[in-house]
Amino acid sequence: MADKEALPKLREDFKMQNKSVFILGASGETGKVLLKEILGQNLFSKVTLIGRRKLTFEEEAYKNVNQEVVDFEKLDVYASAFQGHDVGFCCLGTTRSKAGAEGFVRVDRDYVLKSAELAKAGGCKHFNLLSSRGADKSSSFLYLQVKGEVEAKVEELKFDRLSVFRPGVLLCDRQESRPGEWLARKFFGSLPDSWASGYAVPVVTVVRAMLNNLVSPSSGQMELLENKAILHLGKDRDVPKL
């Protein structure tokens, strides 16, 4: 990871490369903030959203955002949507309470993995995966097991660069109700950073960590950033505002 003092120059150097990016899950809490930050920092020459429905934006800054509407149950038919992107961000995810156990696995593992496969085939060099603290394919908890499984499967695809982010409880005003998460946000949000750093993180911090890591030199083919590393890397406040 680069020293924070070097980030402004790294951002400018990255912009000069005129890269393109796609975002999966731009309608979710993390995806929405990610899109806003990407546009605010003006990092890419082309920004594409891939999702099951077209999103509506009123702000002028979003006017050049491309959108590809796909059926995640038939992703092979939409392979062209994944072609020609240098960088990909995957923020796809649902909950067991909303989709049921099978639906959760379908979205968080199958959709994510198939999207990664198509992105790799389409020329994506750097894939960024939003996972979860505690992800472990051997876990007895379905959520952590699925997150661990998809991490391992995506790593097998051998992207030139794979960055996996494992945040703790995401601190945000989530529109979708997730049992237990609201209480966790209230609890961790009231604690000093030094206490909460291993367990919780603001969504905007996760997003800024993703983008600061993006413009920084790679530390290897596969990078795994746990919650504390995300907090450290994402606290840079010297970023452009949209």
Swiss-Prot record:
Its main location: cytoplasm. The gene is Htatip2. One of its GO terms (molecular function) is NAD binding. It comes from Mus musculus. Disruption phenotype: Mice are haploinsufficient for tumor suppression. 50% develop tumors within their second year. 30% of the tumors are hepatocellular carcinomas. Mice develop more cardiac hypertrophy and cardiac dilation following transverse aortic constriction (TAC) surgery. Keywords: Acetylation, Cytoplasm, Disulfide bond, NADP, Translation regulation, Tumor suppressor. NADPH binds at residues 27-30, 52-53, 92-93, 143, 147, 170, 178. InterPro entries: NAD(P)-bd_dom, NAD(P)-bd_dom_sf, Semialdehyde_DH_NAD-bd. The modification N-acetylalanine is found at residue 2. This is Protein HTATIP2. The active site is at 143 (proton acceptor), 147. It is found in: Cytoplasm. It comes from the Eukaryota. GO terms for biological process: alpha-amino acid biosynthetic process; angiogenesis; apoptotic process; cell differentiation; positive regulation of programmed cell death; positive regulation of transcription by RNA polymerase II. The keyword Acetylation applies. CDD domains: CC3_like_SDR_a. The keyword Cytoplasm applies. Pfam families: NAD_binding_10 (PF13460). GO terms for cellular component: cytoplasm; nuclear envelope. Represses translation by preventing reactivation of elongation factor eEF1A. May also inhibit nuclear import by competing with nuclear import substrates for binding to a subset of nuclear transport receptors. Has additionally been proposed to act as a redox sensor involved in cellular oxidative stress surveillance. Monomer. Forms homodimers during oxidative stress. Interacts (via N-terminus) with elongation factor EEF1A1 (via middle-region); the interaction is direct and competes with EEF1A1 binding to guanyl-nucleotide exchange factor EEF1B2, thereby inhibiting GDP for GTP exchange and reactivation of EEF1A1. Interacts with nuclear transport receptors XPO4, IPO5/RANBP5, IPO7, IPO9 and KPNB1 as well as GCN1L1/GCN1 and LRPPRC probably through their HEAT repeats. Binds NCOA5/CIA. Residues 2-25 are annotated as: Required for interaction with elongation factor EEF1A1.
